[in-house]
Amino acid sequence: MFGKYEQNFNAHKPLSTIAKFKYGTMPKKDKLGTGHYHAFSGYQIVGTYPEVMFENPQLIIVARGVGGCGDVKYTPANCYLTNLSIAIITEKTMHDDYLYHYLRLHDTKIMNTGSAQPQITVATLEKFEIPIPPEEEMIRFSDFVQPFKQQYRNNHDENKLLSKLRDTLVSKLMSGELDVSDIDI
């Protein structure tokens, strides 16, 4: 899908043509660890927070740090995004799907501007040129990837649930609270 537009430089436009950007913010230390929402750095969940920034999974780019500056990913649902990342906000799901896959397939680390520590700025993202296919093709692409995206999220949620179950069962087995010696396998 992306290949035929790569060489057509008339199709290249600034990323700001189909997206807006929002910096995550530094969580207040006295609030970190309180609340029911995930505090997400772009690298991982770093605790809980009482405020939510995004209710649905949000497309982001990690904007600071040696280990992953330029990585493109989705946040968990119901999260507060910290200042290490920038949200890539689109009005249409098809743009979200296209940008996620396009940016993951290309070297976004070339946008790094920091000298001591790599960083990506909103200004750099706004000017970054990408090929933008016709809307009909983006719709077709989005329709194709949606079932895979949903299955990935379902599998991720199930893995989290199974991990919690494992941790609970192992704890009960180790404490003697649960006895499985009579089970015949």
Task: List the model feature ranges, each with a label.
Residues 1-41, 131-180:
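Non-catalytic DNA-recognition/assembly elements of restriction-modification systems
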